[in-house]
Amino acid sequence: MNHLATSKEDILAASRELIRENGWAAVSIRAVASRCSVSTGTIYNYYGSKADLLGDTIESIWREIFFQPEDEQVFKDVVACISWIYKRLEYGNKQFPGFFSLHSFVFMKDEKTDGKKKMLQTWEHIQNGLCDILKNDPKIRSDVFDQQFTERQFADILFSFILVSMIRQDYDPSSVYHVWNDGSSVRQWRCIPPDSSCNRTLYNRS
């Protein structure tokens, strides 16, 4: 038995390893204590319940998946950002098999609202990032978005495609690229009846 103090980082690392090896069902206070070679009481010093432990574990997995990229240009170009997101999702699926499955989402929802809350916070962070990039990508035409069709609305559309890909474990971003490259068709969905303002491409044309 390891009688030395165990840090929260060690506990979360052990939890991630258990999920990586055997999925969500493998995580329990007792299993994590055994992996850390400490008593269950040591784990309870940090987490009052399994649900609390899972909540922080979920957050730590999302952080590992969406670790800050070395190339900051990723956040200045929509296509580059989408490509990076899909690559990180593929990494996450390899490191934590089944993490993105529909079963896992239901599990997190049923287990404790804290896990669901932290998952939704991550999703909101991605959506906000897409929105910011849509506002700042210099290649996007300045007249594409307006009060009727905002950057936020298009970011939500892009994210919905990403979310479906995540659940299906399909890490080919081509469908999102298609929506992005043919952004005028997305605008037409919102124009009833269609008018000339719908006929816009997203990019500046030289």
Where are these regions (language model features)?
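Amphipathic alpha-helical packing segments from all-alpha helical-bundle domains
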Residues: 94-98, 111-140, 149-152, 156
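Short, charged helix-capping/linker segments at alpha-helix termini
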Residues: 25-26, 142-149
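Short, basic, alpha-helical segments at the C-terminal edge of helix-turn-helix-like DNA-binding modules
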Residues: 59-66
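Helix-loop "lid/cap" segments that line or gate small-molecule binding pockets
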Residues: 86-94, 102-110, 133-135, 166, ...
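Hydrophobic alpha-helical connector segments
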Residues: 56, 70-95, 151-155
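Short alpha-helical scaffolding segments that buttress acidic/His motifs in well-ordered protein cores
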Residues: 89, 103, 158-162, 199
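Helix-turn-helix
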Residues: 4, 10, 14, 18-52, ...
